[in-house]
Amino acid sequence: MVVVGIVGASGYTGGELLRLLARHPEVEEVRYATSRRLEGKPVWKVHPNLRRDYPDLEFSDPDPVEIGEDCDVVFTAVPHTAAMELVPDLLEGGAVVIDLSADFRFDDVDVYEEWYGVEHAAPELNDEAVYGLPELHRDEIRRTDLIANPGCYPTGAILAAAPLVEEGLVDVVIFDSKSGTSGAGAKPSEVTHHPECAEDLTPYNPTDHRHLPEIRQELGKLGDVEVHFTPHLAPLVRGIETTAHGLGDVEIEPKELRELYVEYYDGEPFIRVCEVGEAPRLWAVRGTNYCDVGVFAVGDGRVVVASAIDNLTKGASGQAIQNMNVRFGFEETAGLEEPGYHP
């Protein structure tokens, strides 16, 4: 069993980590839930759904080295550019670190610095980090102490297109993604304020979203492919629906395409391939670590694949716990087996 710390526990991803860890069979204790702003406040005051699970746990702000010394694994759920200041001390303390920010996701530090506009504070650790998408990097995850949890959009996009790219069926993939507002975090803004977005559907950063180089990096490891990506803010709380348009010299029947996906993801506990012509539904994955994938072959050198994930679970905290399970040799599904909600 493991002792866990969460650095940055007051936001949505921190709350989702707490929710999923509360009944994890291999978690002895969540010892730290940190927040400088809320130090001393009961965790359940911010996450009232967890009142019975954490009646005595309070937000704290200890030294990162101390957290690393006291915990077997630490999740960093802090903003981009903040994690790289903390991770070296957490590792020095002896903990395995699973970072939910973008700070260690890129193989090339220069790419990170270009897209995030800051100089990397711990480039010496970048080569040690493993991109934490278990479906592609399970063996490497088992051997590292620094796991870079993928972004929410890249998770849905990469899982939708990986079989197409690795099999060399397409030359170009165009991703169109719709996300719920929880992906923007707990701090409200004019764009994510409910009256502004409840009856709207808005593309943003249509050609230069920060998740684009992340998708390109991972799919580029599978094959030679050109990647484009446009996200949209949808009037939802949770969920990301991604449609991948694959273009190339490809003619394939829907049944054959589905069989390719079933074989590619055979044995993957959190990938569910829909029936031919069946579209994945967001409500079917809400609150779960599943990624549902639907395949459509339309002819004329084009195939369409859609994926659905919960951006806070498989797109963030659930995947982070999946990575913990893999790293520590637990059952990969431990703490993550609850079905979705309907309706």
Curated annotation (Swiss-Prot):
Catalytic residues (UniProt): C152
GO molecular function, one term: N-acetyl-gamma-glutamyl-phosphate reductase activity
An annotated GO cellular component: cytoplasm
Localisation: Cytoplasm
GO biological process, one term: L-arginine biosynthetic process
The keyword Ubl conjugation appears for this protein: no
EC nos: 1.2.1.38
Primary location class: cytoplasm
CDD domains, sorted: AGPR_1_C, AGPR_1_N
Superkingdom, taxonomy of origin: Archaea
Keywords, in A-Z order: Amino-acid biosynthesis, Arginine biosynthesis, Cytoplasm, NADP, Oxidoreductase
Catalytic activity reported: N-acetyl-L-glutamate 5-semialdehyde + phosphate + NADP(+) = N-acetyl-L-glutamyl 5-phosphate + NADPH + H(+)
Presence of the UniProt keyword Metal-binding in the record: no
Pathway: Amino-acid biosynthesis; L-arginine biosynthesis; N(2)-acetyl-L-ornithine from L-glutamate: step 3/4
The family this protein is said to belong to: Belongs to the NAGSA dehydrogenase family. Type 1 subfamily.
Purpose: Catalyzes the NADPH-dependent reduction of N-acetyl-5-glutamyl phosphate to yield N-acetyl-L-glutamate 5-semialdehyde.
HAMAP family in alphabetical order: ArgC_type1
UniProt-recorded name of the protein: N-acetyl-gamma-glutamyl-phosphate reductase
Lineage: Archaea, Methanobacteriati, Methanobacteriota, Methanomada group, Methanopyri
